[in-house]
Amino acid sequence: MNTEALIEAAVEVDVQEAAPVVEPDIEVIPAIEAPAASLPAIVAPNLDDSSLYIHRELSQLQFNIRVLEQALDESYPLLERLKFLLIFSSNLDEFFEIRVAGLKKQITFAREQAGADGLQPHQALARISELVHGHVDRQYAILNDILLPELEKHQVRFIRRRHWTAKLKAWVRRYFRDEIAPIITPIGLDPTHPFPLLVNKSLNFIVELEGIDAFGRDSGLAIIPAPRLLPRVIKVPEEVCGPGDNFVFLSSMIHAHADDLFQGMKVKGCYQFRLTRNADLALDSEDVEDLARALRGELFSRRYGDAVRLEVADTCPKHLSDYLLKQFNLHESELYQVNGPVNLTRLFSITGLDSHPELQYPPFTPAIPKLLQNSENVFSVVSKQDILLLHPFESFTPVVDLLRQAAKDPHVLAVRQTLYRSGANSEIVDALVDAARNGKEVTAVIELRARFDEESNLQLASRLQAAGAVVIYGVVGFKTHAKMMLILRREAGEIVRYAHLGTGNYHAGNARLYTDYSLLTSDDALCEDVGKLFSQLIGMGKTLRMKKLLHAPFTLKKGMLDMIARETQFALDGKPAHIIAKFNSLTDPKIIRALYKASQSGVRIDLVVRGMCCLRPGIAGVSHNIHVRSIIGRFLEHTRVFYFLNGGDEQMFLSSADWMERNLDKRVETCFPVEGKKLILRVKKELESYLTDNTHSWLLQSDGRYVRSMPTGNQNARSAQATLLERLSNPVLSVR
């Protein structure tokens, strides 16, 4: 599949002219419609006008809705379609735990603050509720009416109670008696048994009872919390249900045998529910003496934050759902009635069935550059030239190998490393431990506040400290999100620096799922800059002048704004001007205003924004030269790439940062140049493969809608990820 050439439009369309945003024959999906902008045609638009901006949370929701749409795409294997549906659930959980919780908190403390779009938090919550209710209903309809029936055709069955045979009922009874009942603790509700404090996102049941117990109590209600250690999906042996993969939901088992938990009482109804709580840590790092100790205390509190959402079975009577809403101090608009398990993310356990490889993506082996294949010593290769890798198409192994070799190399003196998310069984951490034990000076800058990875990071910090490494937790008030490694090695009597800089985390698992760039370099100036940044993080001192590296919160934002302004001036001077940027999110108002000005001046701007985008493209007189697309596919798009035509002297940058205020103003981030015509051309071609994608590309319209791009006429189907997979990796019979 050849998509290496520039888009014809990118070559032929004059940058001074507006190009249409919507291509012909594009499938429009009204379900993801956002509030439309009403923009009068004015000569000098006010770039602070709120109608020029899309609300952040609504844009984030639309990304998740695009993820849900993939569950309907028959070009994906069936179990992968199920994964997309489950990712929608997982993303929605975090959205409520963090974003919705934040909006509710503003209202609670009377601190409502509108963003650039002008929408107040209470208005945003109303729109969020409307959107989410509709798409949660749609999600369960896709599951029940499309995916589960299709899976059944492949002998993957989720057997509902109404279809249980006598043999299956007997097996379920034994399983319930032996594995479930002994560890379940039902709680009757009365004055001495108050409503329990339920853990965030845990599975629970509200039970309506009739009768009087041994103590003469007649409460009428009970709660059954399902222990988290129990699997939510249980596989049934073939001798019970016949051949195939047959599963029963834990919730169905508890429903069927709730009577056994209340001997002598009549169960009138048993209904599953799940509560979502605020999971954002209320930790002010400036007010604590020991961040690690304070964080351990906050992690426990996270499980019991304020309620933000209630999910119940759609068969639950109104008087019971109203009772639950009252217990959790929630409004009826925060109630979600679902036709199926209340926590679909627990179905991830069955998406990798060994018995059905045909229902999953075909395996592949990430490639290793020939230069590294032919050399056992990574240092000898990197000392001669930069090595650029694009994961997962190219392997993350060279990055790990560099650190492993450093750990054993007698000439290596010191290793410095940032860690944001590295996983529980990290090869990177293993190598750092080995390096410390082998007498190297190892310093790890670990970001303890990486959301939902805090506990894992605390554990690896303890492990590194036990090995003798120096561990610090970044800078108070700023998350350390930069991805960088520095190795100091003595060669011919001198200390030589080697560095790794990346757009993604030091996480070998994610490197198989996320697209990210890695640069291995021994460039003197760049490695010196990395050393300076580590000195800033580890010690104290004034801002140090960098030669090549842009870094937040100091020079990165200004550098980006300056480069956008430079392209703007080229366009005003009648010269070709072009910006291509690919990243995860665009929310920073200053960056958006700069892009609007560039568009007005005639700069052609192509943005590939996977997630949130608060900019409205295609507005006459404002953003008519801006095109925004989002790519959703097999791999999570995670690279941050910035290209500037620069009057013909092209510049390319890779970064750990998105164009968001939090990244540019409140985090430690890096942005580094891609140097040399060969590497710049390579990255540019890879960017262009995304701009020509017409199978997994969604185009953002000026009214906030996304429409899916599709091949037109005799146009061949083009997928950026498929092209890069074909070009860079090696398909094989088994994953390695």
UniProtKB/Swiss-Prot annotation:
GO terms for molecular function: ATP binding; metal ion binding; polyphosphate kinase activity. It catalyses: [phosphate](n) + ATP = [phosphate](n+1) + ADP. Its EC number is 2.7.4.1. GO terms for biological process: polyphosphate biosynthetic process. The keyword Metal-binding applies. It is an enzyme of class 2 (transferase). Pfam families: PP_kinase, PP_kinase_C, PP_kinase_C_1, PP_kinase_N. One of its GO terms (cellular component) is polyphosphate kinase complex. InterPro entries: PP_kinase, PP_kinase_C_1, PP_kinase_middle, PP_kinase_middle_dom_sf, PPK_C_dom2, PPK_N_dom, PPK_N_dom_sf. Belongs to the polyphosphate kinase 1 (PPK1) family. Catalyzes the reversible transfer of the terminal phosphate of ATP to form a long-chain polyphosphate (polyP). This is Polyphosphate kinase. The gene is ppk.
